[in-house]
Amino acid sequence: MYYVSTRDHSLQYTPAQAIAQGLSRDGGLFLPVSIPKLPEGALKKMTGMTYQQRAQYIMSLYLEDFTAEELGQFAEKAYGPDKFDTPAVAPLKKVDDGTYCLELWHGPTCAFKDMALQMLPYLLTASLKKNQEEKTVCILVATSGDTGKAALEGFKDVDHTKIMVFYPKDGVSDIQQLQMATQEGANVGVSAVVGNFDDAQTGVKTLFSDESLREELAQRGYFLSSANSINWGRVLPQIVYYISAYCDLLAQGAVTEGEPVNFCVPTGNFGNILSAFYAKEMGLPIGRLLCASNSNNVLTDFIATGKYDRNRPFYNTVSPSMDILISSNLERLLYLLSGGDDKLVAGYMKELSDTGCYQVSEEMRKKIQSVFVGGFSSEAETEATIGKMMDEHKYLIDTHTAVAFHVLEQYRKETGDQTKTVVASTASPFKFCDAVLDALNVTDKATGTALLDQLAEVSGMPAPQPLATLKDKQVRFTSWTEKEQMRAVVTDFLK
């Protein structure tokens, strides 16, 4: 199975080439030329498998230049007990009769990004070998909070790799910033960027398409790749947990085979919910995909009107990982729903770059609305949902998961749709102690890492080990840069 760019499908790439390159040189995103279907009886077969076995089975359908043995080894290492604090890896928790929560934050950095970023280093280093690449890969990452730490943790001290992470200077939580600032490893770098996440992400994308930078780094023995969800190696491992969740529902007798289930996903860059769409296209019985946004509700408006318009105020919210106005992975959906019309997609992306907006056709809008439902949650609604979940279900959730639960509640009220629904829980509540304590009406709050102990006491839940040990770690990275200087930061890092 070959891969092509969303903006020019005339060139074909192997899976290893697509993963190693990360972003196509025309600025487009790689995706497979076709979507493999789940074989007959596959869901039933997978109910008896471990998470690692499911990952091997599903990923092998997309990665034909990797052996089953290789993928099996990668899955055992990526999702092993030394990395995840539960054998289930991504456990499904029942909230009430029709609602389940897919906990995706049991990995080493306590966010769903671990599900892909523990796997990506194995996929990337194996891809380099398959491509007979002798240069060192430098991974550039723009983060709205969680990706940065998960990528740093995944790639620290991995041979033939260096990783540089950029995050918005005042746009991540204190715990997220501390996680990155204390990162260990000899091959890692971290810098804040003055501006918001979109500034950091646009800066990184600009570096990828900078020919003179590519030549300069090649002479020094480096080439650039990405660990953001623009890399197919990030999207693919995420498909696994949607299929795995359905298999768990089958195993528990909560659904019968073929019964449709809705998924509600907190959404920023559109990568997580895109993986759910791929699972649906593979044949997973999914009814609706609920796209849950915060006050930066550019996607809610897009799904409703077909107009994508980032010309709007940018809000720093209590769910910072979704504070995004340019949702990169939407480009892959547009390519899929247009039947692979690369010129159309390239045109939309040029309009977005030049004017900040584009309008899809009525036909495309209807296709989007046949699967996706958009909704958003205000700051007050997000906080109220955290309190409500604690009061009614004794279940502590983070701010991003709260956005999804609120959107689900609104959707059910408006439509009466009582289809069983799985909410993707994307981060541990302990990553956002400040906002969660506010939601629980705690007025006299601690500061720094003492917030972790305070939330543990108030909630009766222990802080996850990777966060509880932060207070003992040394701060290594404190620098910041203007977005115009990101190129200099990278060249300096690679001296």
Predicted regions and their residues:
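PLP-dependent amino-acid enzyme catalytic core
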Residues: 1-495
